[in-house]
Protein backbone atom coordinates (compact mmCIF):
# COMPACT_ATOMS: atom_id res chain seq x y z
CA UNK A 1 0.00 0.00 0.00
CA UNK A 2 1.25 3.48 -0.83
CA UNK A 3 2.00 5.51 2.29
CA UNK A 4 1.02 9.08 3.06
CA UNK A 5 3.61 11.65 4.15
CA UNK A 6 3.73 12.59 7.82
CA UNK A 7 0.64 14.64 8.75
CA UNK A 8 1.02 18.42 8.82
CA UNK A 9 -0.24 20.80 11.48
CA UNK A 10 -0.56 24.57 11.21
CA UNK A 11 0.82 26.73 14.01
CA UNK A 12 -2.57 28.43 14.31
CA UNK A 13 -5.74 28.86 12.29
CA UNK A 14 -5.57 31.92 10.03
CA UNK A 15 -8.64 33.60 11.55
CA UNK A 16 -9.90 34.96 8.22
CA UNK A 17 -13.48 33.76 8.56
CA UNK A 18 -14.79 37.16 7.45
CA UNK A 19 -13.22 36.66 4.01
CA UNK A 20 -14.70 33.33 3.03
CA UNK A 21 -17.72 35.02 1.44
CA UNK A 22 -15.40 36.93 -0.92
CA UNK A 23 -14.30 33.71 -2.63
CA UNK A 24 -17.37 32.91 -4.68
CA UNK A 25 -16.24 33.51 -8.27
CA UNK A 26 -13.10 32.80 -10.27
CA UNK A 27 -12.17 36.49 -10.46
CA UNK A 28 -12.16 36.67 -6.65
CA UNK A 29 -9.57 33.91 -6.26
CA UNK A 30 -6.03 35.10 -5.34
CA UNK A 31 -3.64 35.12 -8.30
CA UNK A 32 -1.39 32.59 -6.53
CA UNK A 33 -4.03 29.96 -7.28
CA UNK A 34 -6.08 31.41 -10.15
CA UNK A 35 -3.01 31.71 -12.40
CA UNK A 36 -1.71 28.23 -11.68
CA UNK A 37 -1.81 26.10 -14.86
CA UNK A 38 -3.81 23.33 -13.14
CA UNK A 39 -6.26 25.45 -11.15
CA UNK A 40 -8.99 25.24 -13.81
CA UNK A 41 -8.65 21.46 -13.88
CA UNK A 42 -8.89 21.29 -10.09
CA UNK A 43 -12.23 23.12 -10.19
CA UNK A 44 -13.87 20.54 -12.47
CA UNK A 45 -15.96 18.87 -9.79
CA UNK A 46 -18.07 15.90 -11.00
CA UNK A 47 -20.51 16.56 -8.17
CA UNK A 48 -21.46 19.96 -9.63
CA UNK A 49 -21.86 19.22 -13.33
CA UNK A 50 -19.55 21.92 -14.63
CA UNK A 51 -20.75 24.56 -12.17
CA UNK A 52 -18.06 26.27 -10.11
CA UNK A 53 -19.58 27.39 -6.79
CA UNK A 54 -17.42 29.04 -4.16
CA UNK A 55 -17.07 25.78 -2.25
CA UNK A 56 -15.41 24.08 -5.23
CA UNK A 57 -13.07 27.03 -5.83
CA UNK A 58 -12.01 27.02 -2.17
CA UNK A 59 -11.41 23.26 -2.24
CA UNK A 60 -9.16 23.69 -5.27
CA UNK A 61 -7.24 26.43 -3.44
CA UNK A 62 -6.79 24.13 -0.44
CA UNK A 63 -5.52 21.22 -2.53
CA UNK A 64 -3.14 23.41 -4.52
CA UNK A 65 -1.76 25.07 -1.38
CA UNK A 66 -1.17 21.64 0.17
CA UNK A 67 0.81 20.68 -2.92
CA UNK A 68 2.80 23.92 -3.20
CA UNK A 69 3.71 23.86 0.49
CA UNK A 70 4.81 20.22 0.30
CA UNK A 71 2.16 18.93 2.69
CA UNK A 72 0.91 16.35 0.20
CA UNK A 73 2.64 14.63 -2.70
CA UNK A 74 2.50 16.44 -6.05
CA UNK A 75 0.80 16.74 -8.42
CA UNK A 76 -2.71 16.82 -6.97
CA UNK A 77 -5.65 16.08 -9.27
CA UNK A 78 -9.39 16.55 -8.92
CA UNK A 79 -11.44 13.62 -7.67
CA UNK A 80 -13.32 11.74 -10.38
CA UNK A 81 -16.23 10.72 -8.15
CA UNK A 82 -18.54 12.65 -5.83
CA UNK A 83 -17.12 10.82 -2.80
CA UNK A 84 -13.73 12.56 -2.60
CA UNK A 85 -12.34 15.96 -3.58
CA UNK A 86 -8.85 15.21 -4.89
CA UNK A 87 -6.02 12.70 -5.21
CA UNK A 88 -2.41 13.33 -4.26
CA UNK A 89 0.43 12.62 -6.68
CA UNK A 90 0.36 8.91 -5.87
CA UNK A 91 -3.38 8.62 -6.31
CA UNK A 92 -4.26 8.64 -2.61
CA UNK A 93 -7.86 9.86 -1.99
CA UNK A 94 -8.48 13.06 -0.01
CA UNK A 95 -11.57 14.88 1.19
CA UNK A 96 -11.35 18.63 1.90
CA UNK A 97 -12.95 20.25 4.94
CA UNK A 98 -13.07 24.04 5.29
CA UNK A 99 -14.80 24.78 8.61
CA UNK A 100 -16.08 28.31 9.17
CA UNK A 101 -15.97 30.24 12.45
CA UNK A 102 -18.57 32.92 13.16
CA UNK A 103 -17.74 36.54 12.42
CA UNK A 104 -18.49 39.57 14.59
CA UNK A 105 -22.25 39.94 14.90
CA UNK A 106 -23.10 36.33 14.05
CA UNK A 107 -25.55 34.72 16.46
CA UNK A 108 -24.23 31.19 16.17
CA UNK A 109 -21.26 29.44 17.72
CA UNK A 110 -18.65 27.15 16.24
CA UNK A 111 -19.72 23.51 16.72
CA UNK A 112 -16.47 21.63 17.31
CA UNK A 113 -18.38 18.44 18.15
CA UNK A 114 -20.29 18.47 14.86
CA UNK A 115 -17.26 19.34 12.71
CA UNK A 116 -15.25 16.57 14.37
CA UNK A 117 -18.00 14.11 13.45
CA UNK A 118 -17.93 15.12 9.77
CA UNK A 119 -14.14 14.66 9.68
CA UNK A 120 -14.25 11.27 11.39
CA UNK A 121 -17.05 10.17 9.08
CA UNK A 122 -14.69 10.66 6.13
CA UNK A 123 -11.74 9.04 7.91
CA UNK A 124 -13.78 5.86 8.35
CA UNK A 125 -14.42 5.58 4.60
CA UNK A 126 -12.35 3.92 1.90
CA UNK A 127 -11.96 4.86 -1.77
CA UNK A 128 -10.01 3.34 -4.68
CA UNK A 129 -6.57 4.75 -5.37
CA UNK A 130 -6.56 6.64 -8.67
CA UNK A 131 -3.73 4.55 -10.14
CA UNK A 132 -3.71 1.18 -8.38
CA UNK A 133 -7.51 1.01 -7.83
CA UNK A 134 -6.76 -0.55 -4.45
CA UNK A 135 -9.19 0.66 -1.78
CA UNK A 136 -7.48 2.95 0.72
CA UNK A 137 -8.63 4.84 3.83
CA UNK A 138 -9.65 8.37 2.90
CA UNK A 139 -7.46 11.20 4.22
CA UNK A 140 -8.78 14.65 5.15
CA UNK A 141 -7.24 17.99 4.20
CA UNK A 142 -8.40 20.40 6.90
CA UNK A 143 -8.24 24.00 5.66
CA UNK A 144 -8.15 26.17 8.78
CA UNK A 145 -8.00 29.51 6.94
CA UNK A 146 -11.53 30.50 7.93
CA UNK A 147 -11.33 29.39 11.55
CA UNK A 148 -10.47 31.26 14.73
CA UNK A 149 -7.39 29.86 16.52
CA UNK A 150 -9.46 28.95 19.57
CA UNK A 151 -11.97 27.05 17.41
CA UNK A 152 -9.20 24.97 15.87
CA UNK A 153 -7.95 24.09 19.36
CA UNK A 154 -11.48 23.07 20.34
CA UNK A 155 -11.80 20.95 17.19
CA UNK A 156 -8.49 19.19 17.83
CA UNK A 157 -9.63 18.51 21.39
CA UNK A 158 -12.89 16.95 20.17
CA UNK A 159 -11.07 14.81 17.62
CA UNK A 160 -8.77 13.46 20.32
CA UNK A 161 -11.70 12.79 22.65
CA UNK A 162 -13.54 10.85 19.97
CA UNK A 163 -10.51 8.74 18.97
CA UNK A 164 -9.24 7.55 22.35
CA UNK A 165 -9.30 3.94 21.13
CA UNK A 166 -7.57 4.68 17.82
CA UNK A 167 -5.58 7.92 17.78
CA UNK A 168 -3.62 6.72 14.76
CA UNK A 169 -6.59 7.60 12.56
CA UNK A 170 -5.72 11.28 13.07
CA UNK A 171 -2.49 10.73 11.16
CA UNK A 172 -4.66 11.05 8.07
CA UNK A 173 -5.64 14.65 8.89
CA UNK A 174 -3.51 17.28 7.14
CA UNK A 175 -3.93 20.94 8.11
CA UNK A 176 -3.28 23.88 5.80
CA UNK A 177 -3.87 27.63 5.58
CA UNK A 178 -4.24 29.17 2.12
CA UNK A 179 -2.67 32.54 1.32
CA UNK A 180 -5.37 35.11 0.64
CA UNK A 181 -2.89 38.00 0.36
CA UNK A 182 0.52 38.34 -1.31
CA UNK A 183 3.41 37.74 1.11
CA UNK A 184 4.16 40.92 3.06
CA UNK A 185 7.61 42.47 3.27
CA UNK A 186 9.36 41.94 6.60
CA UNK A 187 8.52 45.47 7.77
CA UNK A 188 4.90 45.10 6.65
CA UNK A 189 4.03 41.73 8.10
CA UNK A 190 0.80 41.81 10.13
CA UNK A 191 0.87 40.66 13.72
CA UNK A 192 -0.02 37.01 14.13
CA UNK A 193 -3.17 35.96 15.98
CA UNK A 194 -2.17 35.77 19.63
CA UNK A 195 -3.36 32.91 21.81
CA UNK A 196 -4.18 33.25 25.48
CA UNK A 197 -2.03 31.49 28.08
CA UNK A 198 -4.74 28.83 28.44
CA UNK A 199 -4.89 28.28 24.66
CA UNK A 200 -1.10 28.01 24.48
CA UNK A 201 -1.12 25.40 27.25
CA UNK A 202 -3.81 23.38 25.44
CA UNK A 203 -1.85 23.57 22.18
CA UNK A 204 1.30 22.32 23.97
CA UNK A 205 -0.61 19.35 25.42
CA UNK A 206 -1.98 18.49 21.98
CA UNK A 207 1.48 18.59 20.41
CA UNK A 208 3.06 16.44 23.13
CA UNK A 209 0.14 14.00 23.28
CA UNK A 210 -0.45 14.59 26.97
Locate the predicted segments by residue.
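Catalytic toxin/effector domains delivered as secreted proteins or via bacterial secretion systems
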Residues: 4-209
